[in-house]
Amino acid sequence: SLWQFGKMINYVMGESGVLQYLSYGCYCGLGGQGQPTDATDRCCFVHDCCYGKVTGCDPK
């Protein structure tokens, strides 16, 4: 879940860690479009695709 993902980020990076990802790259935060900018952004892309499986999103 998004809540668990946020908890993991805060655990690794500290309490404000999740705030750093609200507008990171193309896919971290709300929405997304284009190609992921790096491995971290790709992780956010894959996370978004998990929730979008019903629309046929394929993160390969």
UniProtKB/Swiss-Prot annotation:
Signal peptide from the UniProt entry: none
Active-site residue list: H47
Cofactor(s) recorded in Swiss-Prot or TrEMBL: Ca(2+)
Alphabetically ordered keywords of this record: Calcium, Cytolysis, Disulfide bond, Hemolysis, Hydrolase, Lipid degradation, Lipid metabolism, Metal-binding, Myotoxin, Secreted, Toxin
Superkingdom as given in the UniProt entry: Eukaryota
Record field: catalytic activity: a 1,2-diacyl-sn-glycero-3-phosphocholine + H2O = a 1-acyl-sn-glycero-3-phosphocholine + a fatty acid + H(+)
Any GO BP: phospholipid metabolic process
Residues that coordinate or bind Ca(2+): Y27, G29, G31, D48
EC number: 3.1.1.4
Subcellular location, record wording: Secreted
Pfam families cross-referenced by the UniProt entry: Phospholip_A2_1 (PF00068)
InterPro entries linked: PLipase_A2, PLipase_A2_dom, PLipase_A2_dom_sf, PLipase_A2_His_AS
Tissues in which the UniProt entry reports expression: Expressed by the venom gland.
SUPFAM superfamilies, alphabetized: Phospholipase A2, PLA2 (SSF48619)
Disulfide bonds: C28-C44
One MF term in the entry's GO annotations: calcium ion binding
Subunit: Monomer.
Biological role stated in the UniProt entry: Snake venom phospholipase A2 (PLA2) that exhibits an indirect hemolytic activity, a low myotoxicity, and induces edema. In addition, this enzyme has been shown to induce the release of some pro- and anti-inflammatory cytokines from human PBMC (IL12B, TNF-alpha, IL1B and IL6 but not variation has been observed for IL-8 and IL-10). PLA2 catalyzes the calcium-dependent hydrolysis of the 2-acyl groups in 3-sn-phosphoglycerides.
The protein's name: Acidic phospholipase A2
